[in-house]
Amino acid sequence: MKKIVWLLAAFLLIAVSQLSGQVQKTIQLPPPQTEIGKPLMQVLKLRQSSRDFDSKALPLQELSNLLWAANGINRAETGKRTAPSAMNWQEVDIYVVMKEGAYLYDAQDHRLSLVSMKDLREATGRQAFTKEAPVNLVYVSDRAKMSGASDDDKTMWGAADVGFIAQNVYLYCASQGLAVVVRGMVDREALTSALKLRPEQKIILAQTIGYPK
């Protein structure tokens, strides 16, 4: 009898450990804390790029605040965002690349949807810190959403709209004491494949976020 009990206990322990090790396909983010932070002028004074990151993971609440600040919905009645976009195309997708996998940020439902179970952080940049920092954001411009625009305009406005989002992230990180740097050196071929991007989706920039070392 004792042997049976022991075997059952061992089985349950293994089952629980396997479940806990599974990557979540959907992560519902908590509501953003919109009442926190430093005054704007102080944040502008503190804004800077950093390349020294601690590997400590960001809490889910911090990630929620960060993504909402980046390009979340701040006017529920219209679905408009914290960052402007040309013609209100809202063509920029944010992919959140972490040790646990790569996720697509869904601003409408303020949640993350799993895209890849692999740790793709190293592909987000050539610098060594990209694979140590807990979060790398990859900004993708979906040209299919930019109806009526020429190829040149799609390139220009896609880059501009990503720039607005990246600056929002810079300001949030300055307010919260996080280290951050935006980068153009990205392994676009590897990420395009791993993130299952369509030909119309173009990687513009990546941005690394974490605690300062």
Which residues fall in each region the model found?
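N-terminal amphipathic, basic helical "cap/leader" segment at the start of enzyme domains
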Residues: 19-133
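Bacterial N-terminal signal peptides
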Residues: 7-16
